[in-house]
């Protein structure tokens, strides 16, 4: 389940994060994985700054051109483009020229760039930092996934299944042309067409009528004739290159429809036949123009004097994509989805310092949102780590506090539940005014935590939640081990979960916050046992998907203890 929780921000678990075509449908341009894993199926894991692997349907296939993998080059003996190191704005336009000897010898050099050797001492590798850099993954997709409203989540999987099956050793190639040459070509064509249109308009004004070669529509009304003339005077040189492939759908449809309306008054019985005739004529004309554009584009690709690229055309639906793959044609770069990805190695434990990851995570989230793309933040179960990162980011932006945003997050995604350690650190982050550098008492506490994670225990003493002093402790009835206090009991919130019918009126269970002694790693539900090794008796159960109380209230997530297994003791008497 992928859920939108805030503007531009989605949350899920690792299983849903693998639904790459659903992510494309949701316009997600970046994925933040809050644990170190290699189970993202569409992510190609390697240590190079380029890749020749691209994800298609459910496998990786090879590409005949290298694609940028990372913004910063990895330490190698090879030379890299010095222009790439400075920023990310040229990433789309850079293609590695090395390792290009393929079996078919069809690979051609795309860029001629100035190269310089990088001093390895100036670059910190992944092994030194023990952190993964953000990288890019590439996915082949038909544009219909984004543009077609009928392609929803219900039939998206069937739509993907209809894509052509390829072997893992298959090679595909994609298509690029030079932006400057294309721009000049289009400008010249636009100027010529504008002059032609002006001459035509002058002739039409002098003649006070509109004349066409086709005699069947020469006597139509002025309004309909003008509408027809607009479509007929257009050409591919006036249409942006990204829309060339849509001409057959929009261009001839409008013209045929206009002709049909015009002819209904004269020959209503022949309007359909007339439409087919004009469609054939127009399709023939468009096919000729497409052949011309394609030949010009191929010439431009052979004259590679600049690495500033623009990508043309679209494959609109899966049928066109399958045909293109069967005939070994070039895949338009517009049908290659570029996904930004970052791994954060966060452990869901009670001694993990999650605040050391927030600055890197926030920069990554901003870089995705600034491009008007959505971002998916997920962890293994989609509960603790990802929700903690989301709370830190949103609270820093809106300044409404961790508790307020946590309640808002749970109202949209009930599974969100940072562990007790993470939540205390988030409250400390709020006390530090969402900064990690400072000279306040709270900043000094965080500096101690950075030096030694054992100092996280000090956060328990600070009472960052501003809770009242607890009155009761709850102990195991069999061994008298202290389990929790009354401040850690979760009361029923009937505004969030409705009470189910046909249940009793009394509660026989107690729901508590997640405690350190509750082990939930890599599981969705389990049994709550006494943490005392000599006892280990069953106290209750837990589930990330929720448990229903005896009164009918549904608690999500739930850590439920049977009231008959614990004793309530006054704290003043136990001291």
Curated annotation (Swiss-Prot):
Catalytic residues as annotated in Swiss-Prot or TrEMBL: 379 (phosphocysteine intermediate)
Region annotation (Disordered) ranges: 185-213
Family to which the UniProt record says this protein belongs: Belongs to the protein-tyrosine phosphatase family. Non-receptor class dual specificity subfamily.
GO biological-process terms attached to the record: negative regulation of nucleocytoplasmic transport; peptidyl-serine dephosphorylation; protein phosphorylation; regulation of cell development
SMART domains (UniProt xref): DSPc
Enzyme Commission number, as recorded: 3.1.3.16, 3.1.3.48
Residues reported to bind Zn(2+): 476, 530
Protein's UniProt name: Dual specificity protein phosphatase YVH1
Gene (UniProt): YVH1
EC class name: hydrolase
Lineage of the organism: Eukaryota, Sar, Alveolata, Apicomplexa, Aconoidasida
Effect of residue 379 to S: Loss of catalytic activity
Gene Ontology CC entries for this record: cytoplasm; nucleus
One annotated GO molecular function: zinc ion binding
Gene3D superfamilies with a match to the protein in the record: Protein tyrosine phosphatase superfamily
InterPro entries linked: Dual-sp_phosphatase_cat-dom, Prot-tyrosine_phosphatase-like, Tyr_Pase_AS, Tyr_Pase_dom, TYR_PHOSPHATASE_DUAL_dom
Cofactor binding comment, as recorded: Binds 2 Zn(2+) ions.
Coiled-coil stretches: none
Domain of life the protein comes from: Eukaryota
């Amino acid at each position: 389940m992928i859920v939108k929780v805030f503007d531009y921000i989605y949350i899920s678990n690792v299983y849903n994060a693998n639904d790459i075509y659903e992510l494309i449908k949701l316009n997600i341009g970046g994925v933040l994985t809050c644990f170190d894993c290699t189970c993202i199926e569409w992510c190609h894991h390697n240590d190079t700054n380029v890749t020749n692997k691209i994800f298609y349907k459910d496998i990786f296939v090879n590409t005949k051109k290298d694609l940028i993998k990372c913004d910063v080059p990895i330490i190698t003996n090879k030379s890299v483009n010095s222009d790439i190191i400075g920023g990310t704005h040229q990433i789309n336009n850079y293609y590695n020229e090395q390792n290009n000897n393929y079996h078919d010898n069809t690979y051609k050099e795309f860029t001629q760039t100035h190269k310089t050797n990088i001093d390895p001492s100036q670059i910190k590798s992944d092994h030194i930092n023990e952190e993964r850099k953000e990288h890019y993954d590439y996915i082949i997709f038909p544009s219909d996934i984004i543009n077609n409203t009928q392609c929803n989540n219900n039939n998206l999987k069937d739509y993907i299944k209809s894509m052509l099956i390829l072997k893992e050793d298959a090679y595909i190639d994609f298509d690029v042309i030079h932006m400057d040459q294309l721009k000049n070509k289009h400008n010249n064509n636009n100027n010529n067409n504008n002059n032609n249109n002006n001459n035509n308009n002058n002739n039409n004004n002098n003649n006070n009528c509109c004349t066409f070669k086709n005699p069947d529509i020469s006597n139509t009304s002025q309004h309909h004739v003008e509408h027809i003339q607009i479509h007929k005077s257009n050409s591919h040189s006036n249409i942006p290159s990204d829309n060339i492939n849509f001409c057959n759908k929009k261009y001839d449809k409008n013209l045929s429809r206009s002709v049909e309306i015009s002819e209904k008054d004269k020959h209503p019985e022949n309007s359909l036949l007339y439409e087919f005739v004009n469609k054939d004529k127009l399709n023939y004309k468009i096919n000729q123009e497409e052949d011309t554009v394609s030949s010009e584009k191929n010439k431009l690709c052979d004259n590679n004097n600049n690495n500033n690229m623009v990508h043309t055309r679209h494959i609109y639906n899966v049928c066109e994509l399958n045909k293109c793959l069967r005939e070994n044609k070039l895949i338009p770069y517009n049908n290659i989805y570029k996904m930004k990805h970052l791994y954060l190695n966060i452990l869901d434990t009670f001694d993990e310092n999650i605040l050391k990851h927030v600055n890197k995570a926030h920069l990554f989230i901003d870089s995705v949102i600034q491009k008007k793309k959505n971002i998916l933040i997920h962890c293994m179960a989609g509960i603790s780590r990802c929700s903690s990162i989301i709370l830190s980011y949103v609270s820093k932006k809106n300044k409404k506090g961790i508790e307020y945003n946590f309640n808002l997050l749970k109202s949209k995604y009930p599974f969100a539940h940072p562990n007790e350690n993470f939540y205390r650190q988030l409250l400390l982050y709020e006390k530090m005014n969402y900064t990690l550098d400072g000279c306040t008492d709270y900043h000094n506490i965080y500096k101690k935590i950075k030096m030694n994670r054992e100092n996280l225990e000090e956060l328990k003493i600070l009472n960052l939640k501003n809770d009242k002093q607890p009155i009761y402790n709850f102990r195991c009835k069999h061994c008298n081990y202290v389990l929790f206090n009354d401040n850690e009991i979760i009361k029923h919130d009937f505004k969030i979960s409705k009470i189910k019918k046909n249940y009793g009126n009394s509660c026989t269970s107690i729901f508590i916050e997640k405690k350190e002694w509750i082990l939930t790693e890599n599981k969705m539900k389990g049994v709550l046992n006494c943490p005392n090794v000599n006892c280990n008796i069953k106290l209750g159960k837990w589930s990330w998907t929720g448990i229903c109380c005896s009164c009918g209230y549904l608690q999500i997530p739930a850590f439920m203890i049977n009231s008959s297994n614990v004793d309530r003791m006054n704290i003043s008497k136990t001291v």
